[in-house]
């Protein structure tokens, strides 16, 4: 929930005032013969422009015209369409006039004289009260604020107003779980748009068995809707909403102007949640946002949809998980609720699909005061979110390991060592892993800055030496950022390191060095041996210690995820307890209907020293 009620109330007041003013102006304009809308979409990268408007007969016209076409041709086409619309109206009137009287059964009088053929209406385009010449090209003629006149009807031209290019509600909507529409806005942005949520006044009658007609048939009256009182992009249904469908009324905007509003209704009604989730008990420790002296940090591999929705995942990796619980729409409900319930200041996520970041995580977490940045890897990527009231983003320094190793002089010595082992070098350079590095500055004390790193190292069980090389590149790069670019700033390094505490990678991070004879240098056999000694100057600690596991699937469980912190500048205030073993294994393993990933989030409160 919001922890800034004053700000939220002020924002709601602004939105309400804008909506009220828009409705008042619309009513005022209507009373004096307000102009209809003619919406023009014209972008330089496309050869055609689109023109959309409603004719007097109620039909809606969508036209595509070449931008390089003279205006006169477009106006002529509009006149033809208007004439056809007029003819349809006349034909409908004639048909009604000749229809037998339903009450007496007596036919109406004869048709009488035929009406005169309708003439093509005069169509003109005006700009600043002057007619636009018909030889002007469409691209130049259709300006914002121009007036299109079709016969006696005038239309105000709106060129490139904000518009939704995509608008969709999730399939699964559950009580107690945030609902965030998937949307795309052209010539605008979600933050400048208006939203209002409604719910049905009563549930729809269920469709009878056998597929017979139900209360939702076309002949049935439309369902009644009640305002929920929520005017944000994200809505969290309550238990009182179970069985009711939701409706969202939204108006695209950019902070200065608004486009045509749209409405969408949920396909399915709100369902009951899955019961107790693995994170519910953890939320008891994170009910409030921490004070300025603390940094609540989360690291979490949320399981990319690109991996969850494969036949291999369903039949081999997670055969114990109900298929619907692997679907993205379902898992997003749980992920959003889990993350928002931590009230975190920093969230580092791995295995984030691009669409999940833009359409789900960004809007949902933004509503709770967080801003985020994304780094794509290949099929998925990394996301780092920070609380806007505590931090601002100063700079980003993301790298791909294989690119940095080959091109950055910082890693010249390491590359020379690796070049002595061609087979190992080839394998290392084939990997697409990245590290996301963000420098944040405290909004309360500008002298306090922090380097936040986030990564997902190579996954293969026999890739120990590859992870060692990747970690050496990461730590050298982080040192450059935290010592050379921003001297002396502390480091928080989160991620899925795919390494248990017994591995060389973990030993290297915690102890600051690794010997050339460590067994991980031959993790994939003698052919890929690459013995070398490595060291780094950081003093790092695992903030959450060494849990028994952070990854729990049918065939494996172990600790793979860590939040490494700079011992010189940070200390641990508290670690949020992980779910109990009973909670994790309630449905055999992870993921499950009550847990959205095969990993468990690490959550801790850090304190500046």
Swiss-Prot record:
EC number: 3.1.4.-, 3.1.13.4
Entry binding sites for Mg(2+) 2: 496, 498
Compartment(s): Mitochondrion matrix
Transit peptide, residues from-to: 1-16
Active site, UniProt feature: 496
GO cellular component term of the entry, any: mitochondrion
GO MF annotation: an example: metal ion binding
Expression (tissue specificity): Liver.
Record GO biological process: antiviral innate immune response; cellular response to dsRNA; cellular response to interferon-alpha; cellular response to type II interferon; mitochondrial mRNA catabolic process; mRNA processing; nuclear-transcribed mRNA catabolic process, deadenylation-dependent decay; positive regulation of viral genome replication
Short name of one Pfam family: Exo_endo_phos
Intrachain disulfide bonds: none
Chief location of this protein within or outside the cell: mitochondrion
Bias (Low complexity) ranges: 214-224
Region Disordered, annotated ranges: 203-231
Cofactors that this protein relies on: Mg(2+)
SUPFAM superfamilies assigned: DNase I-like
Ligand binding (Mg(2+) 1): 351
Tagged with keyword Signal: no
Keywords (A to Z) from UniProt: Exonuclease, Hydrolase, Magnesium, Metal-binding, Mitochondrion, mRNA processing, Nuclease, Phosphoprotein, Transit peptide
Reactions this protein catalyses: Exonucleolytic cleavage of poly(A) to 5'-AMP
Similarity annotation: Belongs to the CCR4/nocturin family.
UniProt-recorded name of the protein: 2',5'-phosphodiesterase 12
Gene symbol of the encoding locus: PDE12
């Amino acid at each position: 929930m919001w922890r800034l009620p004053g700000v939220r109330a002020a924002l709601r007041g602004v939105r309400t005032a804008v909506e009220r003013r828009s409705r008042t102006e619309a009513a005022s304009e209507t009373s004096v013969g307000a102009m209809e809308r003619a919406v023009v979409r014209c972008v330089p990268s496309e050869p055609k422009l689109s023109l959309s408007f409603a004719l007097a007969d109620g039909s809606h016209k969508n036209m595509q015209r070449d931008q390089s076409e003279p205006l006169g041709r477009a106006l002529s086409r509009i006149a033809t369409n208007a004439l056809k619309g007029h003819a349809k109206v006349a034909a409908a009137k004639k048909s009604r006039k000749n229809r037998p009287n339903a009450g007496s059964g007596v036919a109406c009088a004869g048709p009488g004289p035929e009406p005169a053929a309708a003439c093509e209406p005069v169509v003109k385009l005006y700009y600043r009260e002057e007619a636009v010449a018909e030889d002007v090209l469409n691209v130049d003629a259709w300006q914002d604020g121009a007036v299109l006149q079709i016969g006696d009807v005038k239309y105000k031209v709106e060129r490139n107003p904000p518009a939704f290019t995509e608008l969709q509600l999730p399939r699964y909507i559950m009580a107690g779980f945030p609902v965030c529409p998937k949307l795309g806005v052209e010539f605008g942005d979600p933050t400048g748009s208006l939203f209002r949520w409604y719910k049905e006044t009563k549930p729809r009658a269920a469709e009878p068995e056998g597929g017979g007609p139900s209360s939702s048939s076309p002949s049935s009256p439309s369902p009644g809707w009640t305002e929920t009182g929520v005017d944000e992009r994200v809505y969290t249904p309550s238990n009182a909403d179970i069985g009711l469908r939701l409706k969202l009324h939204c108006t695209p905007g950019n902070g200065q102007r608004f486009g045509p509003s749209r409405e969408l209704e949920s396909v399915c009604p709100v369902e009951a949640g899955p019961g107790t989730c693995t994170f519910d008990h953890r939320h008891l420790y994170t009910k409030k946002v921490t004070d300025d002296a603390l940094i609540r940090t989360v690291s979490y591999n949320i399981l990319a949809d690109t991996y969850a929705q494969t036949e291999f995942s369903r039949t081999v990796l997670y055969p114990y998980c109900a298929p619907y619980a692997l679907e993205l729409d379902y898992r997003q409900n749980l992920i959003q609720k889990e993350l928002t319930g931590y009230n975190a200041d920093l969230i580092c996520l791995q295995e984030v699909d691009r669409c999940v970041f833009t359409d789900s995580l960004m809007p949902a977490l933004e509503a709770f005061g967080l801003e985020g940045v994304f780094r794509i890897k290949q099929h998925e990527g990394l996301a780092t979110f920070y609380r806007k009231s505590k931090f601002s983003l100063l700079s980003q320094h993301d790298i791909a390991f294989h690119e940095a190793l080959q091109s950055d002089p910082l890693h010249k010595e390491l590359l020379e060592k690796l070049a002595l082992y061609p087979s190992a070098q080839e394998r290392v350079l084939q990997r697409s892993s990245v590290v996301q590095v963000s420098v944040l500055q405290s909004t309360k004390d500008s002298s306090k800055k922090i380097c936040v790193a986030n990564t997902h190292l190579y996954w293969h069980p026999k890739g120990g030496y590859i992870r060692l090389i990747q970690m050496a590149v990461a730590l050298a790069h982080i040192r450059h950022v935290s010592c050379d670019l921003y001297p002396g700033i502390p480091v928080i390094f989160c991620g899925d390191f795919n390494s248990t505490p017994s591995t060389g990678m973990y030993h290297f991070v915690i102890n600051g060095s690794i010997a050339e004879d460590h067994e991980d240098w031959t993790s994939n056999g003698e052919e890929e041996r690459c013995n070398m000694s490595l060291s780094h100057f950081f003093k790092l600690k695992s903030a959450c210690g060494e849990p028994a596991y952070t990854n729990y699937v049918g065939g494996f469980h172990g600790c793979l995820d860590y939040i490494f912190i700079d011992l010189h500048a940070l200390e641990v205030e508290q670690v949020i307890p992980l779910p109990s073993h009973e909670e994790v294994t309630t449905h055999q393993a992870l993921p499950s209907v009550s847990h959205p990933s095969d990993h468990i989030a690490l959550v801790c409160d850090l304190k500046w020293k």
